[in-house]
C-alpha cells in the first residue's frame, strides 16, 4: 500500500478509537444499554422473542445480533429466540413489490410479532421510513420497542420504549458503536440467562 492509503486507514482507526472512547464514557448510552439488556432478558425469560430490523449496514448488524442470541455469544448455553427480519428475500421482495419498501419490516412485525416480544430497530439516521413503520406496527401489537440511532436520530425516540444514541453523526462510526454496544448487551443478556440455569 502507498503512504496515502496508510494515512487514510490510520486516520479512520484514530477516529474510531476516539468515538469508542466517547461511547465508553457516555453515561446516557451506558444506562440505556443496561435497560435494553434488562428488557430483552425479561422477554426471553418469558418465552418471547427478539425481532431485529435495519437497512444496509444496520441490516448486517441485525443479523449479527440475532446470530449471537440464537447461537451463542461466549458461553455454551441453550438457544434463545431472535430473528433478523432482514434475511427472507422472498418475504422482503414480495412485500416490497406489493406494499412498497417502506412496509417490508412492518408487515413482518404484524405477522410474527406478539405482545411481550421485543423489536430492536436500528437506523443510523433515525429517519428511515421502513424502520419507523416497523416501530409503529410493533407499538400497535404490544411489543417493547428499542431503537439504536446516531446523534441526529433523536426523533425516532418518540416510537421507542428505549433509545440508544451513539455519540456521533458519522455513519460508519455510529455503526461501529452500535455493534460494539450490542456485543456488550449480548454478553449481559447471556450472563443473566445463564444465572437462571445454574
Swiss-Prot record:
What does the entry list as the binding residues for Zn(2+)? Answer: 64, 68, 175, 183
Per the record, what are the reactions this protein catalyses? Answer: 2 D-sedoheptulose 7-phosphate = D-glycero-alpha-D-manno-heptose 7-phosphate + D-glycero-beta-D-manno-heptose 7-phosphate
Residues that, per the record, bind substrate: 55-57, 68, 97-98, 123-125, 128, 175
The protein's required cofactor(s) are namely: Zn(2+)
Provide one Gene Ontology cellular component: cytoplasm
Q: Which Gene3D superfamilies match?
A: Glucose-6-phosphate isomerase like protein, domain 1
Annotated GO biological processes are: carbohydrate metabolic process; D-glycero-D-manno-heptose 7-phosphate biosynthetic process
Pathway noted in the entry: Carbohydrate biosynthesis; D-glycero-D-manno-heptose 7-phosphate biosynthesis; D-glycero-alpha-D-manno-heptose 7-phosphate and D-glycero-beta-D-manno-heptose 7-phosphate from sedoheptulose 7-phosphate: step 1/1
Q: Which UniProt keywords apply?
A: Carbohydrate metabolism, Cytoplasm, Isomerase, Metal-binding, Zinc
Q: What is its EC number?
A: 5.3.1.28
Keyword Repeat listed: no
Pfam families, per database record: SIS_2
Compartments in which it is found: Cytoplasm
Organism's domain of life?
A: Bacteria
| Domain named SIS: residues | 40-198
GO molecular function per UniProt: carbohydrate derivative binding; D-sedoheptulose 7-phosphate isomerase activity; zinc ion binding
Q: What does this protein do?
A: Catalyzes the isomerization of sedoheptulose 7-phosphate in D-glycero-D-manno-heptose 7-phosphate.
State the family it belongs to: Belongs to the SIS family. GmhA subfamily.
Tell me which PANTHER family the record gives: DNAA INITIATOR-ASSOCIATING PROTEIN DIAA, SEDOHEPTULOSE 7-PHOSPHATE ISOMERASE / DNAA INITIATOR-ASSOCIATING FACTOR FOR REPLICATION INITIATION
Q: Give additional notes from the record.
A: The reaction produces a racemic mixture of D-glycero-alpha-D-manno-heptose 7-phosphate and D-glycero-beta-D-manno-heptose 7-phosphate.
This chain's protein is named: Phosphoheptose isomerase
- The organism of origin for this protein: Bradyrhizobium sp. (strain BTAi1 / ATCC BAA-1182)
Q: Which gene specifies this protein's sequence? A: gmhA
Amino acid at each position: 500500500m502507498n503512504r496515502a492509503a496508510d494515512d487514510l486507514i490510520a486516520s479512520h482507526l484514530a477516529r474510531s478509537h476516539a468515538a469508542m472512547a466517547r461511547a465508553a464514557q457516555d453515561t446516557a448510552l451506558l444506562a440505556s444499554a443496561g435497560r435494553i439488556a434488562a428488557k430483552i432478558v425479561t422477554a426471553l425469560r418469558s418465552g418471547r422473542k427478539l425481532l431485529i430490523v435495519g437497512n444496509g449496514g444496520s441490516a448486517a448488524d441485525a443479523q449479527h445480533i440475532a446470530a449471537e442470541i440464537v447461537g451463542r455469544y461466549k458461553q455454551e448455553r441453550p438457544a434463545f429466540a431472535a430473528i433478523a427480519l432482514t434475511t427472507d428475500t422472498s418475504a422482503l421482495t414480495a412485500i416490497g413489490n406489493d406494499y412498497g419498501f417502506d412496509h417490508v419490516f412492518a408487515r413482518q412485525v404484524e405477522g410474527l410479532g406478539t405482545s411481550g416480544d421485543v423489536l430492536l430497530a436500528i437506523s443510523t439516521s433515525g429517519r428511515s421510513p421502513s424502520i419507523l413503520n416497523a416501530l409503529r406496527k410493533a407499538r400497535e401489537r404490544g411489543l417493547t420497542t428499542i431503537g439504536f440511532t446516531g446523534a441526529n436520530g433523536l426523533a425516532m425516540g418518540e416510537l421507542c420504549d428505549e433509545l440508544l444514541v451513539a455519540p456521533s453523526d458519522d455513519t460508519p462510526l455510529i455503526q461501529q458503536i452500535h455493534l460494539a454496544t450490542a456485543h456488550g448487551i449480548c454478553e449481559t443478556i447471556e450472563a443473566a440467562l445463564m444465572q437462571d440455569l445454574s
